[in-house]
Amino acid sequence: GGWVVDENNTPTVDTPEFKAAMQEYLDLYALGSTLDKDDIVASVTSGETALAQIWPGWYTPTADGPANYTTIPTKLTDDSAPVDAVALQGVWCIGIPDNAPHKDLALELLEYVMSPEVQLASIENNGVPCRYSCLTDSTVLETYPHLQTVCGALETGVYRPVIEEWTEFTNILGTEMDNIIQGTKTMDEALAYAQEQLEQLMA
């Protein structure tokens, strides 16, 4: 894999690292079709799938179920190369906009939603708590041991770039990646164009 922006949020998609990651994706894509979310969850639940990469909120393992969680390995070799995190965190952020008309009420809501009591209660409804205390609570882990794995992934994972233009960024890059997959552009053509468009977006 590779970063799509550098430390200054300058796009870095027309690079050898991104091209290598894209080629790896193409090789995987050629092995078979992908499933949508509901089909992935159904195949995991039924035990038909040997391995699936999913968001924790999609599937809750049970004691007698056919599947369980494991953290994606951070390294597959035993050489001396540095260990890089490979788990990607989806960024679900809650905040109060500057132009919010009722900031005091919004703050009260946030304090309620983020309270330990509400976060613990969310687990019983297949929620994934965002409080460390909930993910490491020994009583919780007795019933929901998979949350220990979730916590481990959160500790070793990396977050998407924190950029205001993320939606537009992924639309531009995703369109050009699809052009590569469909064969309407070469990888060099598509990524050079994506780089140009993304640089304009981030300027």
Across the structure, where does each feature detected by a protein language model lie?
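Short, well-structured alpha-helical segments that form the helix of a local strand-helix-strand
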Residues: 44, 187-198
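Paired acidic/hydrophobic, glycine-rich loop segments that form the ligand-binding mouth/hinge
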Residues: 50-55, 70
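Long, aromatic- and glycine/proline-rich binding clefts that accommodate carbohydrate-like moieties
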Residues: 74, 123-175, 179
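Soluble non-cytosolic domains of exported or imported proteins
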Residues: 12-19, 38, 100, 104, ...
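Extracytoplasmic/periplasmic substrate-recognition and gating elements
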Residues: 30-34, 63-128, 184-185
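Short helix-initiation/N-cap motifs at beta->coil->alpha
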Residues: 34-46
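Glycine-centered hinge/linker elements that transmit conformational signals in sensory
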Residues: 7-37
